[in-house]
Regions:
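Conserved small helical "lid"/interfacial subdomain of P-loop NTPases
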Residues: 3-23
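Active-site ExK catalytic segment of metal-dependent nucleases
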Residues: 231-242
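Short, hydrophobic beta-strand segments that form beta-sheet elements in well-ordered domains
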Residues: 265-274
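Domain-level recognition of nuclease-like catalytic cores that cleave nucleotide substrates
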Residues: 274-297
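Accessory nucleic acid-recognition modules appended to NTPase machines
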Residues: 52-230
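Arginine/glycine-rich "motif VI" loop of SF2 helicases in the C-terminal RecA-like domain
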Residues: 203-204, 252-265
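Active-site-adjacent loop/helix micro-motif of nuclease/hydrolase catalytic cores
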Residues: 240-251
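Amphipathic alpha-helical "lid/sensor" segments that cap RecA-like P-loop NTPase cores
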Residues: 23-69
Length: 297
């Protein structure tokens, strides 16, 4: 059972259907009601059913309670192997700092060495990560491997994600105010929240979510690939003209590289945002700009 999406918890109005975007509608125009402060709170609250509807302070405590339960109880219950809660906490903090990247075990080990008093060896890190996967705390995203016009080498490493962004904020001791004071960091956690929701929506459409990155550094945050071969390219941005322009450039560059003689062209290209007054389709290139507060499956 996955955490709830913003549509399931009632924060997204659901005016834009991800499934409908695969039909490439000519025009969309819907109002978004969520502000950046709302998004910061929802990242830290998470999609935990018991947190929905509670007063803000009590709702935020649910993620910390979950984090404590994972590190002190659940991590041992999964296979009966005793694991030190303090070690689990240190690893989860390192994982949180590298969420949304293709960080290797070696990278996580170096992070632990730089940020904590004692490092863990490779086998211990791998063992702990496997236990966290079994209790559905982390869920890495596989790489997408399309047919390209060029011989560009595609990175095949999985991308690191918790199943809910609030696990990462709890591990690092962050709250909504911390995110509002550091929008760059907030962008990484917002991406994780979007991935959480997209995974639920994709499963409802008989699809999966992938990540694309190649040797040149071209990267696409999410690719929704359906069983029938249709797919959509998605960039995640907090919002604002500059970031949206970056997203447009990325989506256009990747789309131009795809060899459409060997596979379908993307059914849609979308920039999923935290802010913005409306969901709409750009006339010049057909890219959809959709606030997360408007999206459903």
């Amino acid at each position: 059972m996955r955490p709830m999406t913003l549509f399931e918890s009632g924060e997204s109005n659901g005016k834009i259907s991800l499934g409908n975007l695969f039909t490439t509608p000519e025009k969309i125009l819907e109002k978004n009601e969520l502000k950046l402060q709302d998004i910061a709170f929802l990242i830290c609250r998470g999609g935990w059913p018991m947190a929905v509807g509670l007063p803000e302070e009590a709702a935020l405590e649910q993620a910390f309670d979950y984090y404590d339960a994972v590190t002190k109880e659940d991590i041992t219950k999964v296979d009966g192997v005793k694991r030190a809660s303090e070690r689990v906490q240190r690893l989860m903090r390192a994982y949180a700092r590298h969420q949304g990247t293709q960080a290797s075990v070696t990278t996580l080990k170096a992070d632990l060495k730089n940020n904590d008093t004692a490092a863990l060896d490779d086998d211990t890190i791998s063992s702990y990560l496997e236990a966290l996967r079994k209790i559905f705390v982390v869920e890495d995203m596989p790489a997408w491997n399309p047919n390209l016009r060029s011989k560009t080498a595609i990175r095949t490493a999985d991308t690191r994600y918790f199943v809910d962004p609030s696990i990462a904020t709890a591990a690092l001791g962050l709250g909504p105010a911390d995110l509002m004071n550091d929008l760059k960091t907030m962008g990484f956690f917002f991406e994780a929240m979007c991935v959480r929701d997209l995974r639920v929506f994709a499963e409802a459409l008989n699809g999966k979510v992938y990540h694309y990155r190649d040797k040149s550094g071209l990267e696409c945050d999410a690719v929704i690939h359906l069983r029938n071969g249709q797919y959509g390219l998605i960039e995640v941005k907090l919002g604002g003209e500059t970031l949206i322009k970056e997203g447009v450039e990325t989506l256009t560059a990747l789309s131009d590289q795809i060899d459409t003689t060997r596979m379908k062209a993307p059914a849609f290209k979308m920039i999923l945002t935290a802010t913005g007054e409306h969901a709409y389709r750009r006339l010049e290139d057909g890219i959809y700009i959709v606030p997360i507060g408007c999206l459903k499956q």
